[in-house]
């Protein structure tokens, strides 16, 4: 079975007690970031499974998705770096340029310079809250896909024709073809 690991990095919202502006009562995920990333990954998995099972009905493939977070008891950055080094991709929601998300993005960009097969970096942002002039120039060449929030039913859709889904589907299809190419090359060399 082929398992493709993808992590998502997005801001968490802090809830503060109304009477006391400094007492944090809870943190919770940003539901729109969560919905955008999960929706894209579900669609990628559906498309890839449909495509590979046309050629090979017995083919098994799965996407393992988790939010990017540290493991309890470990130094936070080491844990995040380790997860990124084992992933196919990390999707960063840079809406609002959250400091933790931007720090994690910096780690991913540094790993791209030092790993043989670094995780692909995909950036997403809520279109209504994204200000292109605030995007650091060093990120201008990276893939960025904006999503919109339908406030009537709290759904999320990407406004760029699903380019994130198409790009990830294409990349994963190439990855899944690679073991078959390597096997074919071995068989060809053995018979030469």
Language-model segment annotations:
Residues 109-119:
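Arginine/glycine-rich "motif VI" loop of SF2 helicases in the C-terminal RecA-like domain
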Residues 64-68, 124, 147-149:
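Conserved beta-strand termini and adjacent loop/short-helix elements that scaffold enzyme active sites
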Residues 1-72, 82-84:
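Conserved N-terminal substructure of TIR/SEFIR domains
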Residues 91, 120-124, 145:
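Hydrophobic/aromatic beta-strand patches that form the interior of the parallel beta-sheet core
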């Amino acid at each position: 079975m082929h398992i493709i690991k993808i992590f998502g990095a997005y801001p968490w919202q802090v809830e503060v007690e109304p009477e006391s502006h400094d007492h944090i009562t809870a943190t919770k995920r940003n539901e729109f970031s969560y919905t955008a990333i999960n929706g894209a990954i579900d669609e990628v998995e559906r498309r890839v499974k449909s495509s590979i099972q046309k050629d090979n009905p017995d083919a098994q493939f799965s996407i393992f998705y988790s939010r990017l977070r540290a493991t309890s008891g470990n130094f936070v950055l080491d844990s995040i770096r380790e997860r990124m080094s084992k992933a196919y991709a990390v999707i960063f929601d840079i809406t609002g340029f959250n400091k933790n998300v931007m720090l994690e993005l910096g780690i991913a960009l540094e790993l791209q310079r030092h790993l043989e097969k670094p995780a692909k970096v995909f950036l997403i942002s809520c279109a209504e809250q994204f200000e292109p002039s605030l995007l650091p120039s060093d990120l201008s060449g990276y893939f960025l896909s904006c999503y919109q929030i339908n406030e009537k039913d709290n759904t999320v859709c990407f406004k760029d024709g699903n380019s994130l889904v198409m790009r990830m589907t294409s990349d994963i299809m190439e990855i899944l073809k690679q073991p078959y190419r390597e096997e074919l090359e071995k068989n060809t060399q053995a018979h030469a």
